[in-house]
Amino acid sequence: MARQNKTPLGIFSEAIGLYFSNFDKFIQYMSFPVLGQIAGLGLVLLITFFYTQNLPSLIEKYSALNDFNTLILLSILITLPGLAIFIKAFWDYLVAYGAINSMLDNMLKSGRVYDFDAHTELIKRRSVPFVGLWFLFGIFSLIAVCPLFWVVCGILAVYFVLVFQVFTFEPELSPAQCVKRSLDLVKGHFASTFMLMALVGLLTYLFIPQIVIKLFDMAGISTFLGNLIMPIVNQLPEINLTMYGIPEISKDSIAQFTIQTFVAQILIQYTLPLRSILWSMWYRELSNKAYKLKETTTKKRKTKRPSEKLMEASHKKYGKKKIDTNILKRASEKDED
């Protein structure tokens, strides 16, 4: 059966359906990459908190700690376990973005996802170019921080949105070629790509986090979690913001804001598979369109126009005939007269 072109809205709704129909598997797959980052940072903060609280008594007990270099070294050492967990989880999160792309064929055929380890291994085997691609992405993100480049980088972000899909489905391309390929695919489809980016951005970065945060507030979960981190918040230095014309911010507000930020970040990361599915489907759609356009152009080049056919027939008929020598002789005699 011939494949029908899908509209951006059709792809958006299908991506949502595929994500939520495999929600339990995606939650399980993303749990360590997402919660591992939170656990790693939490461990760093927790150990640092107890370290600073007990530092005076430790210095009294162990005179060797009464040295600046020793304190710095010890401060670094106590954060290493948490940092190790965070880095491992963060790397797995980056790999998951590429791995979920390669699961698309199975999802479209059966509606299910499976064999996560095999798809993850496909990306890890290409870790060097994968890191190179993320390095380019990091440079672009740093440039985008500058307000002078917001408009330009915002436009380029639309054109470069498919770089990781290109990396997954066209493994022969280098990171720089992936960027160029994404730009070529989106070219001519900017409005549709921007619409998809806006839709999935609003859903996964705004609506879902805000709905869950609202439910947490109503259930008192935000207050409960805020109270748990109050001992750490209380260690923050007091700053008189009123002298700068800024209203005073209470410690409770800081704790609530911290919890809401963490909850929103967790939900945004858990919806990574939805974004990955959507952009993989959009890549396939644009890639198929580009292939058909190239095929049509090639056929047109092979099909000769009527004038070209007429010229070719004329050349075949007269091109190889020799000019009569008598004609040349008569022409030269006329020139002499």
Give, region by region, the residue ranges found by the protein language model.
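N-terminal juxtamembrane cytosolic/stromal segments of multi-pass membrane proteins
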Residues: M1-Q28, Y114-E121, K322
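Juxtamembrane transition segments at transmembrane-helix termini in multipass membrane proteins
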Residues: A2-R3, E14, Y51, L55-Y62, ...
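Hydrophobic, aromatic-rich membrane-embedded alpha-helical segments
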Residues: A15, F90, L94, G138-Y159, ...
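Hydrophobic alpha-helical transmembrane segments of multi-pass membrane transport/permease proteins
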Residues: K25-Y51, K88-W91, L136-F140, M195-I211
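Membrane-embedded or membrane-proximal helical elements that form or frame transporter/channel pores
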Residues: N66-D92, K251-I259
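Alpha-helical membrane-spanning segments of integral membrane proteins, especially the hydrophobic core
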Residues: I72-L77, P81-G82, Y114, A118-L142
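Hydrophobic alpha-helical transmembrane segments of multi-pass membrane proteins
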Residues: L83-W91, P147-V151, I259-T271
